Amino acid sequence: MSVRHQRPVFDTEPPGELDGRGRHGTVLCMSDEPAEGTARPESGLTDDDFSPIWADDDRPRIPRVAGEREALVAYLEYYRATVAIKCRDLTAEQARTRSMPPSSLSIHGVVRHLAGVERWWFQQNFERRDVPFLFFTEDDPGLDFDPPLDADFSADLGTWRAECVVSREIVAAHDLDDIARPLDWYEDVDLRWLVLRMISEYAQHCGHVDLLREGIDGRTGA
């Protein structure tokens, strides 16, 4: 499992003698990337020790200074990209592997679930489009997390990517203040709430995928 460690950024000299307040300088902020020229504690650890990164990471960087819309979209896209890189180089059998018993989760199941969630919130709820459910029936509501034996991982991954494309188009066509009344909800929601809801959804399942991938082939990295 990959763990990101934050470290303090100091506005004075690197840790040496304690100052009068019993600490090494003044901590300005917590950062997972040192500012240019910032001294690091002489711990002998490298950047990779602090924050191991996926070896072939090509995810879009999240801007540190951004407007509300840019920041929200950037975080959602980062999590989508995280799911994508954790699916790379997996066989269909590996993707179906329930590698963290007693959990019945698999990467294939998570991908199917996220495809359905993209459609459910953006198309079926926010824009009230008359489109069928993905991987869900009244007789078998768990078709997303429990793929049938003949389910094609590559095809389902493609379906998830296609749903993300449609979701992006919907977000681009609306203001964050635009209101919708979801099909199963009794209160209005705006697009801002919905994007935050999706960020929360992806953050949860990125943690699942992180563990599942490590259980499959040992690969780790934030």
Describe each model-derived feature in a short phrase.
Residues 2, 12-15:
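Short linear motifs in low-complexity or flexible loops
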Residues 30-55, 59-61, 69-142, 182-222:
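Short, contiguous alpha-helical
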Residues 142-178, 192-198:
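Acidic/histidine-rich alpha-helical segments that form the ligand environment
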